[in-house]
A protein has these predicted regions:
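N-terminal, polar/charged subdomain of small-to-medium soluble alpha/beta proteins
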Residues: 1-121
Length: 121
């Protein structure tokens, strides 16, 4: 059984876009994350150290993106999911990135899901 931590609409300002002028300055993105993790041990002990600290996740993502740029939000979403698996011990990470670049739409976005590889030590 897996449990899920949900972070909805984390506001990040990152450089992303295919045209260079779009990447010239950080733009507002909303990032939503679902992190699967077994909470049984955390609940048993009522101890954050056995869970995933969602405040630490938010802080890490804010710092991680500083000074970087991406052409595709697809790449950004996959890199965030990989970071959650690698650094926070998520079993599964689903990441949705929304950007507000086309005036005729409310937003454009992508959603990716990545799973930890149980065969990697």
């Amino acid at each position: 059984m897996m449990d899920t931590i949900i972070i909805r609409d984390l506001e990040l300002f990152l450089r992303v876009g295919v045209p260079e002028d779009e990447r010239a300055k950080p733009q507002r993105l909303l990032v939503s994350i679902e992190i699967a993790h077994d909470f049984a041990r955390a609940v048993e002990k009522d101890d954050l150290r056995s869970s995933i600290d969602y405040a630490a996740v938010c802080q890490r993502l804010a710092e991680w993106g500083a000074g970087r740029s991406w052409c595709l939000i697809e790449t950004l979403a996959v890199e965030i999911a990989d970071l959650l698996l690698r650094e926070f011990g998520a079993t599964t990470a689903t990441v949705e990135v929304r950007k507000f670049v086309l005036p005729q739409t409310r937003f454009v976005g992508v959603r990716v899901t990545r799973h930890a590889n149980p065969h990697v030590s």
